[in-house]
Every structure is written in C-alpha cells, then in structure tokens.
Amino acid sequence: IIDNPEITLEANPDDLSEEKIVQLAASSINRLSIGIQSFFEEDLKLMNRAHNAAEAEKSLQLARQHFDNISIDLIYGMPNMSLARWKENIDKALGYGIPHISSYALTVEPKTALAKFVEKGLVSPASDEEAQEHFNLLNETLLDAGFDCYETSNFGKPGYYSKNNSAYWQQKKYIGIGPSAHSFDGVRRGWNINNNPKYIKSIEQE
C-alpha cells in the first residue's frame, strides 16, 4: 500500500448520523463521498431516494465539522428541473465549501419508480439539449468558483482531485471494498457481488 493512500467512504445522507461521522473521522478514512443528488424534495422523491432534503443538508453540516476532503454527487437533467433550480443546487453545494463535486446526467433505469412514471406519461425526461444546458451551467459556475474539470464528470479544487477517479484514466491499480465495488490489478478488472447479505456471508466464509 502506498504512503498516504486516499481512502474514500461512499455514503448516503441517511447513513450519516453524528455518531457515525465521528467514528469515521477517528478511523483511517480520509475522504467522504456523499450521494446528495439534489437539495430539493421533489427531485429526491422522483428518484425514490431514501433521504430527504433536510437530511442532505444535515449530513453536510456534520461532515464539514470532521472532514476536510468531501465530495458530493449531484444529478442534472431531472424532469421539470429549470436552470434556476439547478443553479440553486450548485450554489447550495458551494455554500458548504465542498471541494469536489461529481455530477452525472439522470439515467432512467428500467424497473425503477421513475421509469414507471415515465411509462405512464406522468413525467417527461429532460431532452439532450436541456441536459447539455444544465452541464454547461455547472461547468461555468464551478470553473468561476475555482474548480477544475479534471475528468468528464468530476470537478475538484486544486489538491482535491480524486486519486481514485484519476487512477481510472491512468490505468493505475485500485482496490474496491464492499458490495458492487470494482477493482483493477493492472491487467484485469473485477467487481464484487451487489447483494449486501451475500457479500457479508462471503466475507464471513473466508
């Protein structure tokens, strides 16, 4: 293992109680990646997220007290998301002093609640043009705030680029721990099963 490795924990806002964050800060974990996705209740409900808008903000308030290196995920291209509301999402993140943001266009996955809404005509996915406008606004706003777009979907302030994200493009080795986590040994890529109980059972058997 290299000296001073980046050890990132990925979590959702509803996973991060104050007690849990204090425990994480006392461990070897030195980077938090939080799946905020949106600061708006209607977006979170549409994506069927387990957390609400209040929990999203609370998790960042707590995380900032104990971690310096924090990344959040934000989703753009949401149905009915205006540029103004998307800008509010970005501004909220910047207001918390987050040094790294990963942002992805919404993908409507089969058999999800959102897919059913689309099938029934209750919502319409954003057009490619609308999603592009969202990304352009994100890129412009974050560059003005001192971020660099160092990888397609990742923006970081100098010194806060994700070593893990950079490793993908540089073909470096990395280890993923946990359900669905991917690893690369320099030759082959592999990934763990995505079922939590089965993953835990497999560890206990080893």
Language-model-derived ranges and their functions:
Residues 1-206:
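C-terminal scaffold of the Radical SAM
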